[in-house]
């Protein structure tokens, strides 16, 4: 895993890597069901959020500086006293080999920002890798996720 390096991309640098990042974001969006896409962000929405610092972009590059994995997060404020880093999109072509580096850079950012927890919704296939890094599945009897189109 030492051949990968993770970075938080600053808003002023988004334009420098956008042509490499946008297709990865779109690939991630393409995995979302059509019904859910109606209320989901577009790549342009994410770019605006990065510039407004409403969302964070993390990248993992290989030894040739090719972007292999991206992660997008936003900080949620719960009850105005607790910060939680919500991981809202992960995409790329090498999750298996470089997820640990993405975790390291995102977790370091979350701690600097005073977050007490990281939360993500992901595919079931991600579970084994996430569990090796200390993630736990949250199971509650009374929780459901519902959506209604208007």
Model-assigned labels for residue ranges:
Residues 82-133:
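Acyl-donor binding region in acyl/amide transferases
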Residues 34-57:
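Active-site rim helix/loop that mediates acceptor-substrate recognition in acyltransferases
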Residues 55, 132-135, 139:
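Short glycine-aromatic motifs
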Residues 58-60, 118, 146:
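Hydrophobic beta-strand residues in large extracellular and virion-surface proteins
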Residues 51-95:
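Conserved donor-binding loop and adjoining core beta-sheet/short helix segment
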Residues 136-149:
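Conserved catalytic-core motifs of GNAT/GCN5-like acyltransferases
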